[in-house]
Design a protein with these regions (language model features):
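Redox-cofactor binding/interface segments in oxidoreductases and associated redox assembly factors
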Residues: 58-59, 87
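Short, glycine-/small-residue-rich phosphate/pyrophosphate-handling segment
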Residues: 86-128
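Gly/Ser/Thr-rich loops at beta-strand to alpha-helix junctions
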Residues: 61-65, 91-94
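N-terminal beta1-alpha1-beta2 submodule of the flavodoxin-like/Rossmannoid cofactor-binding fold
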Residues: 1-58, 65-67, 72, 76, ...
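Short, conserved loop/helix-junction motifs that constitute active-site signature segments
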Residues: 50, 76-82, 105-107
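A structural micro-motif
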Residues: 7-9, 83, 109
Length: 147
């Protein structure tokens, strides 16, 4: 939401049709199984039409060193030809290969301003990436949107 608020961009959440249920530990175990299997869950339709956009910032949390399965589904079922994708991810200190994996799945996209945003490795909400770095990145995105 910070990115949308600072850029004035629209926001659309990529959500699974079937929400994750259970304790944090159960959801983590399920997530690991899904990532290891390359599972692509059904996702809900977006609240926006991708055809209306030339620049898309697509973000994901890190799930076992790659993107969340819902984001994998989204990137797999859409064609990004002629669009600029700004891939970004959050992590707790282990970025893995998320950005590379996202780029590999974005068919036809050009890429700009990728970003890794790190939080506390102990599972807390403390931001480790400096706010100055994030502010600079948001400035780059604003310029990309206004080209």
């Amino acid at each position: 939401d910070l990115l949308a608020n600072k850029t004035g961009a629209d926001i659309a959440r990529i959500e699974t049709a079937e929400p994750y249920r259970g304790s944090h530990e159960e959801v983590v175990k399920q997530g690991k199984r899904e990532v290891e299997a390359g599972f692509t869950p059904q996702i809900n339709p977006l609240s926006v039409n991708l055809a209306d956009y030339d620049v898309l910032a697509i973000g994901t949390p890190t799930w076992w060193y790659t993107m969340a399965p819902a984001v994998l589904t989204f990137l797999t079922v859409n064609d990004f030809t002629g669009k600029t994708v700004i891939p970004f991810m959050t992590n707790g200190g282990w970025p893995g290969h998320v950005i590379k994996d996202m780029k590999d799945k974005c068919k036809g996209a050009a890429f700009a301003h990728e970003m890794q945003i790190q939080f506390d490795s102990m599972g807390k909400d403390h931001l480790e990436t400096s706010e100055d770095v994030i502010t600079e990145w948001i400035g780059q995105i604003k310029m990309e949107i206004n080209k």
